[in-house]
Amino acid sequence: MDVLVILKVFPESDEINLTQLSEEIKKRLPEGYRLVKNETEPIAYGLKALIAYIQMPENTEGGTDKLEELVNGIEGVSHAEVVNVTRLGF
């Protein structure tokens, strides 16, 4: 069974292209993970966060920590945090 992780990604500056950032996240996702969709959310002073909806296996060792570490390691990312996790399917 899979879960849907909603991840809020804060860029280092307002000059970071969020579309390119989303593509970089998509490229780096491990096997079994999938970027379902993304959107932007205004934060302050013209800065926007990327909201990434990522499907991943529920029984992943380390849970969402591995995903946060992966995204936090991408150039241009200030930090990323899990906003919500929900189980997919019944």
Curated annotation (Swiss-Prot):
Molecular function terms, GO-annotated: translation elongation factor activity
Keywords tagged on the record: Elongation factor, Protein biosynthesis
CDD domains for this protein: EF1B
Signal peptide coordinates: none
NCBIfam families assigned to the protein according to its UniProt record, in alphabetical order: aEF-1_beta, PRK00435.1
Role description: Promotes the exchange of GDP for GTP in EF-1-alpha/GDP, thus allowing the regeneration of EF-1-alpha/GTP that could then be used to form the ternary complex EF-1-alpha/GTP/AAtRNA.
Family (UniProt): Belongs to the EF-1-beta/EF-1-delta family.
Protein name: Elongation factor 1-beta
Gene from which this protein is expressed: ef1b
